[in-house]
């Protein structure tokens, strides 16, 4: 079973769309499972709705979404008072536009009949545990929204009932482990950060510092996940009479740093990141 694992990265998710234009649209590579965290969950949810053989349609949908996206389609200020809303509101921005965008592109019947598996990861602030949505979990729209609810900027999502879920990147930069547990024998991973994170243009604002910190954390978490996966392969390879097989892991990441602000969904920057993804693929 082959899986595609998509990392978080906010507006840098356009890079994944560009890469998949080549991988799905020109190489016609197919996947049995799509797993994502944060913006990767949004892309995974879109892709999982298409049957084998319809990969070109899937990448056309992603291409249209990311080529025409705008910040207004993702979030807006909660109040006219900007940062003062943090005092009385659960987040700086409202993601009502993002929920509408997710809902407009989601067809539960298509997903149910696609034959594809899905994994989306968020973190429950109440229990500090991971929440995983599969293709069979109710309310996948809320699951996708929860997975990309960047702390402080976006409001946590009360789904499932009794929980309060935020960006899955807090615990998992990529759901590599979820793909392996689901039975994947080959995993393609598309990251939104290059191997060496570039220098930062210092900005003394919380919404600039926060994404920078999360990006550094995510890079470290993925490297740890990859080391664990390689250790798993070594153990399986040396185990006698084991029914488990080593997992082939292919990692793609930007050849150089992408345009930096993960909350900037402007169309021109999105298209630049898409072009970078296509070229790197």
Which positions does each model-derived feature cover?
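Residue-level recognition of short, well-ordered coil/turn positions
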Residues: 27-28, 52, 184, 204, ...
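Exposed alpha-helical structural elements
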Residues: 57, 61, 97, 101, ...
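Short, hinge-like loop/turn segments at secondary-structure boundaries
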Residues: 51-52, 205-208, 268
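Active-site-adjacent alpha/beta core region of enzyme catalytic domains
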Residues: 75-190, 196, 240-281
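Patatin-like phospholipase
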Residues: 2-5, 10-102, 134-146, 191, ...
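Short, solvent-exposed amphipathic alpha-helical segments in soluble enzyme
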Residues: 20-21, 137-138, 181, 204-207
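Helix-centered, glycine/charged polyanion-binding patches within enzymatic domains
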Residues: 186-242
């Amino acid at each position: 079973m082959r899986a595609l694992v998509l990392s978080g990265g906010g507006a840098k998710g356009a890079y994944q769309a560009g890469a998949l234009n080549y991988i799905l649209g020109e190489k016609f590579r197919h996947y049995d499972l799509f797993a994502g965290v944060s913006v990767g969950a949004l892309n995974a949810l879109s892709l999982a709705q298409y049957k084998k053989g319809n990969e070109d349609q899937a990448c056309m949908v992603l291409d249209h979404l990311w080529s025409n996206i705008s910040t207004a389609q993702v979030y807006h200020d909660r109040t006219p008072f900007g940062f003062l809303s943090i005092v009385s509101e659960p987040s700086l921005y409202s993601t009502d536009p993002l929920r509408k965008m997710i809902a407009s592109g989601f067809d539960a019947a298509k997903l149910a009949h696609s034959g594809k598996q899905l994994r989306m990861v968020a973190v429950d602030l109440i229990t500090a545990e991971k929440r995983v949505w599969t293709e069979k979990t109710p309310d996948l729209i809320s699951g996708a929204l929860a997975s990309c609810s960047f702390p402080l900027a976006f409001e946590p999502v009360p789904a499932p009932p009794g929980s309060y879920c935020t960006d899955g990147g807090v615990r998992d930069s990529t759901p590599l482990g979820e793909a392996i547990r689901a039975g994947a024998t080959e995993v393609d991973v598309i990251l939104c950060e290059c191997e060496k994170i570039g220098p930062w243009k210092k900005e003394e604002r919380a919404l600039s510092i926060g994404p920078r910190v999360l990006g550094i954390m995510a890079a470290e978490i993925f490297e740890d996940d990859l080391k664990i996966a390689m250790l798993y392969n070594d153990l399986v390879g040396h185990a006698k009479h084991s029914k488990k097989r080593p997992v082939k892991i292919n990692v793609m990441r930007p050849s150089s740093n992408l345009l930096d602000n993960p909350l900037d969904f402007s169309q021109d920057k999105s298209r630049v990141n898409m072009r970078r993804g296509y070229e790197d693929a």
